[in-house]
């Protein structure tokens, strides 16, 4: 998806770009932020859509679907004791905090290639769907 093609770009800027660089899936999922998901196959696309819809209600009058989980709600996640470094200037991966506390340690990330200093996605806590927005200290200090 682009307004003008590679030939016009070459004429105006003397830069050589192909259609994928100019407006392909990776460009829009990593640079422009137009796309939220990027899939390689139609099957993968349909699976991603199903997964996304599993977190959302069917309409504004319903609750999001409840998914039973067998995780112990009193479980201790020892790894959380060491994720955040003692030095406040050291980076860490926020997903190392998000994933262990979610049901089945599963986090469905939205826009994983765009604005890597922010993490956005869905998960479940005790079977209930939750949306997550967090700074990502591992990139650009969050």
Give the predicted meaning of each segment.
Residues 4-6, 26-33, 72-80, 131-134:
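Short acidic (Asp/Glu) and glycine-rich catalytic loops that position anionic groups and cofactors
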Residues 89-142:
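Non-catalytic terminal/interface segments that mediate subunit docking, oligomerization
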Residues 2, 26-28, 37, 55, ...:
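Phenylalanine-focused residue identity feature
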Residues 6-8, 13-17, 22, 27, ...:
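Short capping/connector residues at structural and topological boundaries
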């Amino acid at each position: 998806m682009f307004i003008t093609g590679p030939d016009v770009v070459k004429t105006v800027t003397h830069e050589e770009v192909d259609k994928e660089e100019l407006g392909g899936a990776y460009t829009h999922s990593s640079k422009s932020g137009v796309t939220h998901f990027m899939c390689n196959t139609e099957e993968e696309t349909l699976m991603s859509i199903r997964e996304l819809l599993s977190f959302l209600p069917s309409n504004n009058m319903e609750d999001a679907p409840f998914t039973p989980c067998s995780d112990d709600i009193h479980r201790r996640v020892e790894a959380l004791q060491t994720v955040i470094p003692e030095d406040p200037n050291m980076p860490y991966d926020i997903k190392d905090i998000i994933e262990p506390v979610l049901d089945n340690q599963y986090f469905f990330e939205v826009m994983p290639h765009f604005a890597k200093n922010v993490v956005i996605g869905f998960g479940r806590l005790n079977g209930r769907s939750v949306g997550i927005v967090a700074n990502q200290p591992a990139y650009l200090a969050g």
